[in-house]
C-alpha cells in the first residue's frame, strides 16, 4: 500500500507536535513546514485538515501556535490514515475507462481486503507510540530553537 504525500506530511507534522517538551513554546505552522521539509502552503493544508479532525489545536496571536490535542495523542494511527486517505481504493475500477470486470472481479475484493489489513496493522499504534525513542529525540533535534 502507498500513502499519499498529504497523509505522509500530516503524520510527520503530528509526530513533530507530539514531542513538544514542557516549557517549549507551541510551534508555528511555518516551523512545522521547515522541520518536515515542505513548503508552508502544503503544511498549512495538512494542519487545517488535522484541526478539522480534532487532533490539532491552533491558537493565534501572542503565545499561540499548534498543539496536539488529547485526542491527537491517543487516537489510532489507522483511524488517522483512513480519514486522511479518504475512500480511495487501491485501484480505480470505475474511473474514466471503467473496467469491464468490475461487477465480477475477485481482484478488487482482494485489494480492498489488503488495504484494510494495512490500516488494521496501524490501528494499535498512536502518534505517541510513533515518537518513542529513537524517533522523538531525532525530531527534537530538527528544530533549531532553544528549549524554554
Curated annotation (Swiss-Prot):
HTH rrf2-type domain ranges (all copies): 2-132
Cofactor: binding comment: Binds 1 [2Fe-2S] cluster per subunit.
Residue ranges flagged as DNA-binding region: 29-52
Gene Ontology molecular-function annotations: 2 iron, 2 sulfur cluster binding; DNA binding; DNA-binding transcription factor activity; metal ion binding
CC terms in the record's Gene Ontology section: cytosol
Cofactor(s) required, per the database record: [2Fe-2S] cluster
Short name of one Pfam family: Rrf2
InterPro entries: Tscrpt_reg_Rrf2 (IPR000944), WH-like_DNA-bd_sf (IPR036388), WH_DNA-bd_sf (IPR036390)
Keywords: 2Fe-2S, DNA-binding, Iron, Iron-sulfur, Metal-binding, Transcription, Transcription regulation
Coiled-coil positions: none
Positions of [2Fe-2S] cluster binding: 93, 99, 105
GO BP of this protein: regulation of DNA-templated transcription
NCBIfam families: rrf2_super
PANTHER family: HTH-TYPE TRANSCRIPTIONAL REPRESSOR NSRR (PTHR33221:SF4), WINGED HELIX-TURN-HELIX TRANSCRIPTIONAL REGULATOR, RRF2 FAMILY (PTHR33221)
Cited function: Binds DNA; this binding is disrupted by nitrosylation upon exposure to nitric oxide (NO) and also by EDTA and iron chelators. The 2Fe-2S cluster is stable in the presence of O(2).
Quaternary state and interactors: Homodimer.
Record's protein name: HTH-type transcriptional repressor NsrR
Organism: Streptomyces coelicolor (strain ATCC BAA-471 / A3(2) / M145)
Amino acid at each position: 500500500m502507498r500513502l499519499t504525500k498529504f497523509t505522509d506530511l500530516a503524520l510527520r507534522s503530528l509526530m513533530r507536535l507530539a514531542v513538544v517538551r514542557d516549557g517549549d513554546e507551541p510551534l508555528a505552522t511555518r516551523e512545522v513546514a521547515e522541520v518536515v521539509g515542505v513548503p508552508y502552503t502544503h503544511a498549512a493544508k495538512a494542519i487545517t485538515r488535522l484541526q478539522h479532525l480534532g487532533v490539532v489545536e491552533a491558537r493565534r496571536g501572542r503565545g499561540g501556535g499548534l498543539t496536539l490535542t488529547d485526542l491527537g495523542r491517543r487516537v489510532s494511527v489507522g483511524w488517522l490514515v483512513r480519514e486522511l486517505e479518504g475512500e480511495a481504493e487501491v485501484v480505480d475500477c470505475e474511473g474514466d475507462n471503467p473496467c469491464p470486470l468490475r461487477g465480477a472481479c475477485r481482484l478488487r475484493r482482494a485489494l480492498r481486503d489488503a488495504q484494510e489489513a494495512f490500516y488494521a496493522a496501524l490501528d494499535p499504534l498512536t502518534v505517541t507510540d510513533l515518537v518513542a525513542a529513537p524517533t522523538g529525540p531525532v525530531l527534537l533535534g530538527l528544530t533549531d530553537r532553544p528549549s524554554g
